[in-house]
Each structure stands twice: as structure tokens, then as C-alpha cells.
Amino acid sequence: MEKSSGEALIRQFASLDVLVAAHGAGVTNIIFMVPNSAVYELFPPFWQYGCYRRLASNVGVLYAKDTAVGVKGRECDRDPNSLYCQYNGIRDRDFVMNVTVIERRMKKVVWEVWNKKYHVVL
């Protein structure tokens, strides 16, 4: 994605039915998705900021999210409410998602896209 031209990036996102992505700046490209496509956002443990939910709503893209289970980094030991903790101890850490959770959510998301975008009932 980082090496794509602007035009290629727009075409890529416009052709998607479902985008599955870890929370991050690249999710802003949902503005190029066709209405009733979907974004499924994966959050690291304890991360709760839903800016892409609002963006999806504004551009007519369906939205789903799940949050990984895990622990905060040691960056949060001193002050769990600090920005340092929020960014380095929570947001910017690797995380692992439960495959069963993703599978369950994807079945719902795909059904919703097919139903709302293509008017097909699975």
C-alpha cells in the first residue's frame, strides 16, 4: 500500500467489499470505498478510540470492530492514564487476535455487505 500511486490506491480501495485492518492511519483510505462496503477494524488490548467508526459512517461504509485480549505494556506502570502509556504501552504494541472471533465477525460482515451492497441474501 505504501508504494502505490494515489490513483492505484483509490482504485484498490474502491474495489474492496471488506477491508480487515489493524487500527492505524491506513484505515483513513476507507473514504475511497463504495458505500455499503465494510471495514473490520482490529484494536490492540485496551484501545478504545473509535475515529474510524465515525469516518465509516460519514462515507456510508459499514463498520465492525473487535479488540484483542492482552496486557498493557510496562510503559503504563508509572501512570496508566498518561499519553505515554496510551501510545507506547497500548496503541503501538503488537497484538494477537483470536481466530474464532475474527471468523465469527467476518461471517456477519460478509452477510451484511452482500445483503446491503448487492441485495443478495445468503
Task: Identify what each model region corresponds to.
Residues M1-L122:
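N-terminal targeting/anchoring "stem" of glycan-biosynthesis enzymes
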